[in-house]
Amino acid sequence: MEKRRMNLPTGPDTLCFDKDEFMKEDFDVDHFVSDCRKRVQLEELRDDLELYYKLLKTAMVELINKDYADFVNLSTNLVGMDRALNQLSVPLGQLREEVLSLRSSVSEGILAVDERMSKQEDIRKKKMSVLRLIQVIRSVEKIEKILNSQSSKDVSSQEASSPLLTGQVLERIATEFNQLQFHAVQSKGMPLLDKVRPRIAGITAMLQQSLEGLLLEGLQTSDVDIVRHCLRTYATIDKTQDAEALVGQVLVKPYVNEVIVEQFVESHPSSLQLMYNKLLEFVPHHCRLLREVTGGAVSSEKGTIVPGYDFLVNSVWPEIVRGLEEKLPSLFNPGDPDAFHQKYTVSMDFVQRFERQCGSQASVKRLRAHPAYHNFSNKWNLPVYFQIRFREVAGSLEAALTDGLEDAPAGSPYCLLASHRTWISLGKCWSDEMFLPLLAHRLWRLTLQILARFSVFVSELSVRPVSNESAKETKKPLTGSKDPSEDQGSHASEASAASISSTQLVYVVSDLGRLQEWLPDLLETVKQKLEMIGFKNFSSISAALEDSQSALSAHVPALSSRIVQDLSESCFSYLKSALEVPRLYRRTNKEVPSTASSYVDSALKPLYQLQSGHGDKVQPAVMQSWLQEALSDSTHRYFETVSDVLNSVKKMEESLKRLKQARRSPATNPVSSSGGGMSDDDKIRLQLALDVEHLGEQIQRMGLQTSDIKSFPALMELVLAARDQAAAEQP
């Protein structure tokens, strides 16, 4: 409860403190004094406190004087209050006794009324039971009377033999029998009902027997009125299922047993289709009358139809499924996947055609919800079929990936057998010979698994050591030089079986490009198949395929790098023969060089072979990029080699000049040819210049620009400067 705030008297404005400080809950004397000392002296604080203390005393006295009369009169007003209260206790006690007595009387009355009402309710229930029993007996007697009168008419008159009259009598009996059943259920447990029950059972048996006979007669004679009266009677007694079961047993089952013959189905591949066609003929030939009466046909008139029946769903279909399961069990065997696929496809087409014979969408829904429909669908062991197909596809693909460097068969757009088999496997998943709509999700997952497996295969190839194909060829040595491959020993023969050639790397890149180029076509095929099952979320399908495509394209840079590296090594393995040029001209008295060395043509041979042999397998831009990068790398190393040779020649020349000056001999320059011709060093410079110029010409013949080859302009500048130096030294 909120505390009541006390109003303190207002002091003069000259006080050095606020009067409300005293009413705060956290008021502290020490804090109050220290706070006031900051403003005034203690003497002034004391004077203000004394002044306010006097004001408080005065206010308290005034408050007491104001309420004094009320304090004095309080005791006076309470005089005699006890006596008045005692006088009230006696009448209140009497009133309490009267109320309790009245309450007891009312409770007794309520109990009496409840007991009487309970007895009346019991009497009413017994009366209702008696009335129901009376109604049961009356209905039994009435039905028996109708039957007896009908029997007497059968003897005395031939009019009763009319099917229409018999149908009307059955409808009257059915109406009364329906009431009989209702009252019998309500009177369950009554002793008298047990005595009447045999008579009820006899009536039931007679009624069902009459209905069955009359319905069969109507169907055999195609009498619409008889069939209509029978079906209406079945509906009246709530026995529509009995009528549907009767039609299934008497009409459908013999026909199904006659049509479904296992020997006939296995005799020819198209026999299953013929069998299904004959089963579908049953509906228009034998169910036309029933469909007209029950409203399942287009020609049915609304005023004459008997609702509540669906003979196609509840009579024809269960018997067809039963016949297929019992007489044709091999139909559902998935051991032979090709035969299983053909049987399943034909069977599902039969189901769709059967659904089209249903009279309405509601009938189709009832058919799909029928237990026999689910049993038929579950009989097809699609998971086992998929596992068999999975082993076929995966086994064939793995066999090809194991022999991954084998060439593709003739006529294939791919270079390698592994790539060819990968594409064949992808196409097979969505081919008409393998695809099933209910397995679309599994086939899509298998598609992604195939692409992922091929990506792993390519990544494994990209880390294999590259076998230098050009190293296996015998290089044409320069005249008077050793075979430059002698220092390599038997390197070419040491290539392991796990290595991969640059040609095969080109095949892999080519196949990757072709596969990525054709993946959109595969996506369109997948979309067409998925539309059959109502799938609409094609964005997720496209995104998943794009991820797989990105994973494949991610291998191209590494493969291209390996190809470029191998080309560069092959090219430079010949270009480094420039180191042999000084040995060919020093102290050999050879003629002045006029043509390039043979190693230049040999160096570019791997590039020519790649361009001419595989130019149609990859895009021109990719091929040009490979050649340009390989030449840039090998030319840079060639530039370093030529620079080293020229520096060595220059150092040798300077060394000989110093030796000549030291000897001061008029002898002939040992580095000069006889007759005062070009020196050996100048011949070396000229030969290197001819080699580099020829290299540039060959590069341009391949469709490349020398300016795009890194280090080639610097190399050309280097050899031209050396040639100019040689020309300047000539007399």
Curated annotation (Swiss-Prot):
Q: What is this protein called?
A: Conserved oligomeric Golgi complex subunit 2
Under the subunit heading, UniProt states: Component of the conserved oligomeric Golgi complex which is composed of eight different subunits and is required for normal Golgi morphology and localization.
Q: Write one Gene Ontology MF term.
A: protein-containing complex binding
Family as reported in the entry's similarity comment = Belongs to the COG2 family.
Going by the entry's taxonomy, the superkingdom of the source organism is recorded as: Eukaryota
InterPro entries assigned:
COG2, COG_complex_COG2_C, COG_su2_N
Q: What is its main location?
A: Golgi
The alphabetical list of record keywords is: Golgi apparatus, Membrane, Protein transport, Transport
Role this protein plays: Required for normal Golgi morphology and function.
Q: Which GO terms describe its biological process?
A: glycosylation; Golgi organization; protein transport; retrograde transport, vesicle recycling within Golgi
Q: Where in the cell is it found?
A: Golgi apparatus membrane
Which Pfam family, any one, appears in the UniProt record?
COG2_N
CC per GO annotation:
Golgi membrane; Golgi stack; Golgi transport complex
Parts forming coiled coils: none
Q: What is the lineage of its organism?
A: Eukaryota, Metazoa, Chordata, Craniata, Vertebrata
